[in-house]
């Protein structure tokens, strides 16, 4: 029994010992001696695989030589060129595009200032403000178009009276001068026009009565002076702000 165990141990030791590497061989392609053994192909001792340091190619002893270019199997690390990624470039362009409309909004807000200074320029600035808000982001002002009609949430006060406007065109540059705003026509309220005319006539009559009771008789020239004064007064008087009503569908 003991003899059997000794033979078994000797067989295991013999099997565990690796065979010595084959001697270096000359390169089959360039005939260079600067070669080294790498491994056995398919774990077969009859197919040792070598590497030539001169032409930097592999070959198997006793096997066919493949047409491999010089240095084709080299895995040297190549220097990478730092190029900006596409996502980073898109994000930069998006930020650049979003910052520009906000600058326009700030300029328009600065131009609006007080509405009493200039009615036409202020309302035009409001129109440009809404146009810039539409360009910022489609989700923020989804249903608002620069050329559509919107309804204001407040009234604009000019001079001493109040100017009420039910609809105005956001995309228009001068909203008060145009006769049609947002596709709707506007006309003066007959009641307000009658009151203004009556007030104007009363003022003229009072001036005429004062001139007639002053004791100075001008004869036929009084009517001419009265007409000239009336024309000058009409040109110099500032029309009282009135209410505009919507005339349209």
Swiss-Prot record:
Q: Which GO terms describe its cellular component?
A: nucleus
Protein's UniProt keywords contain Transcription regulation = yes
UniProt xrefs under PROSITE patterns: ZF_DOF_1, ZF_DOF_2
Q: Which residues bind Zn(2+)?
A: 27, 30, 52, 55
Keyword tRNA-binding in the entry? The reply is no
Q: What is its main location?
A: nucleus
Domain of life assignment:
Eukaryota
Q: Which Gene Ontology MF annotations are present? A: DNA binding; DNA-binding transcription factor activity; zinc ion binding
Location in or out of the cell: Nucleus
Short name of one Pfam family: Zn_ribbon_Dof
**ZnF endpoints (Dof-type):** 25-79
**Swiss-Prot/TrEMBL keywords:** DNA-binding, Metal-binding, Nucleus, Transcription, Transcription regulation, Zinc, Zinc-finger
Q: Name one GO biological process term.
A: regulation of DNA-templated transcription
| Function field | Transcription factor that binds specifically to a 5'-AA[AG]G-3' consensus core sequence.
This one is known as Dof zinc finger protein DOF4.5
Q: Which organism is it from?
A: Arabidopsis thaliana
């Amino acid at each position: 029994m003991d003899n059997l165990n000794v033979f078994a141990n000797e067989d295991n030791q013999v099997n565990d010992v690796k065979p010595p590497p084959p001697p270096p061989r000359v390169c089959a392609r360039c005939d260079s001696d600067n070669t080294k053994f790498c491994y056995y192909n398919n774990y077969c001792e009859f197919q040792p695989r070598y590497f030539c340091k001169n032409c930097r190619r592999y070959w198997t002893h006793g096997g066919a030589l493949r047409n491999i270019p010089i240095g084709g199997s080299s895995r040297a690390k190549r220097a990478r060129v730092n190029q900006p990624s596409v996502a980073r470039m898109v994000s930069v362009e998006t930020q650049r595009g979003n910052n520009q409309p906000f600058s326009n909004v700030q300029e328009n807000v600065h131009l609006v200032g007080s509405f009493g200074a200039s009615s036409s320029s202020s309302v035009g600035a409001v129109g440009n403000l809404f146009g810039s808000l539409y360009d910022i982001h489609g989700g923020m002002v989804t249903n608002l178009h620069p050329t559509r009609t919107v309804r204001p949430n407040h009234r604009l006060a000019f001079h001493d009276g109040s100017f009420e406007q039910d609809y105005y065109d956001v995309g228009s540059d001068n909203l008060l001068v145009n006769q049609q705003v947002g596709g709707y026509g506007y006309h003066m309220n007959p009641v307000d026009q009658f009151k203004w005319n009556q007030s104007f006539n009363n003022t003229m009559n009072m001036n005429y009565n004062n001139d007639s009771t002053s004791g100075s008789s001008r004869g036929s020239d009084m009517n001419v002076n009265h007409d000239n004064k009336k024309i000058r007064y009409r040109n110099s008087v500032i029309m009282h702000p009135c209410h505009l009503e919507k005339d349209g569908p």
